[in-house]
């Protein structure tokens, strides 16, 4: 029995009536500005592996752009007591972080000798100088005035980073929402110097404990607490994979930006963004 001949590829496309002429129409590449996007990878070394290094960091910056978009929208929604949209946005941020965690697996295919060959071409450029990442840190509440300095050479970038530094963080707005819900949040947590890191407060923990003990009554508040927990959990995983990837590639050498490298990154693992939400789990 002879097999039925398959339809020619050209005929399939014709039958589907696919748009093929883009002389006067916007194409996929036009919409995404792919010429500019794919022209932005400009290795400085002759090393094959530099393309991996560049693409890893550029794609991370694109995901961070989306993170900032979602975080700012989530903060605005919480300010307006629009919790359902905020939940969707915060869940998306957590998923973006999962994507960024998995991306470390690709960079980890670079061996120590391969990185050492391209490292001299990086000069003092380092990931901690990322102005998008710094805004994310500030919006999540990890305020550090010293980290404004790497952006002082660009007034436009400094203005962006400073705006995030001086604004209430995601957690600050979450606490304000609890207060508007009738929960006993101390005034010191509601009106303070937003440029300072948040410090845990027993009264704030009591407010969150009330939410978790009466979750049916405070369902939106409870869901907000869990979305924040998801986000910080994902952020911690990203930080951890950052540490382990750097350690397997450069060991304990100093970072290109002048930090102690892995030692510095390990210190960042100790940062807690939403302290009472974690502590209440012990006290429930």
Curated annotation (Swiss-Prot):
Residues noted as binding heme in the record, renumbered to the chain: 242
Q: Which reaction does it catalyse?
A: L-tryptophan + O2 = N-formyl-L-kynurenine
Swiss-Prot/TrEMBL cofactor(s): heme
**What EC number(s) would the UniProt record show?**
1.13.11.11
Superkingdom is Bacteria
> What family does this chain come from, according to its entry?
Belongs to the tryptophan 2,3-dioxygenase family.
Function, as annotated? Heme-dependent dioxygenase that catalyzes the oxidative cleavage of the L-tryptophan (L-Trp) pyrrole ring and converts L-tryptophan to N-formyl-L-kynurenine. Catalyzes the oxidative cleavage of the indole moiety.
Protein name, please? Tryptophan 2,3-dioxygenase
């Amino acid at each position: 029995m002879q097999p039925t001949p398959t339809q020619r590829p050209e005929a399939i496309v014709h039958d589907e009536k696919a748009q093929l002429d883009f002389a006067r129409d916007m194409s996929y590449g036009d919409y995404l500005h792919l010429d500019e996007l794919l022209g932005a990878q400009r290795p400085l070394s002759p090393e094959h592996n530099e393309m991996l290094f560049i693409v890893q960091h550029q794609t991370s910056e694109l995901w961070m752009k989306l993170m900032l978009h979602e975080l700012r929208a989530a903060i605005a929604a919480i300010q307006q007591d629009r919790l359902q949209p905020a939940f969707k946005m915060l869940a998306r941020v957590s998923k973006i972080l999962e994507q960024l965690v998995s991306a470390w697996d690709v960079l980890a295919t670079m061996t120590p000798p391969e990185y050492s060959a391209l490292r001299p071409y990086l000069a003092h450029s380092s990931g901690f100088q990322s102005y998008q990442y710094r805004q994310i840190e500030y919006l999540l509440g990890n305020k550090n005035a010293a980290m404004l300095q790497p952006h002082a050479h660009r007034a436009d970038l400094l203005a962006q980073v400073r705006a995030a530094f001086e604004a209430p963080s995601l957690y600050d707005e979450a606490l304000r929402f609890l207060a508007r819900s009738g929960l006993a949040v101390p005034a010191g947590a509601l009106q303070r110097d937003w440029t300072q890191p948040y410090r845990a407060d027993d009264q704030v923990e009591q407010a969150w404990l009330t939410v978790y003990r009466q979750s049916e009554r405070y369902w939106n508040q409870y869901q907000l607490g869990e979305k924040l927990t998801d986000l910080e959990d994902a952020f911690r995983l990203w930080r951890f994979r950052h540490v382990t990837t750097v350690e397997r590639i450069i060991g304990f050498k100093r970072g290109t930006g002048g930090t102690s490298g892995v030692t510095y990154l390990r210190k960042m693992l100790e940062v807690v963004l939403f302290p009472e939400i974690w502590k209440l789990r012990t006290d429930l």
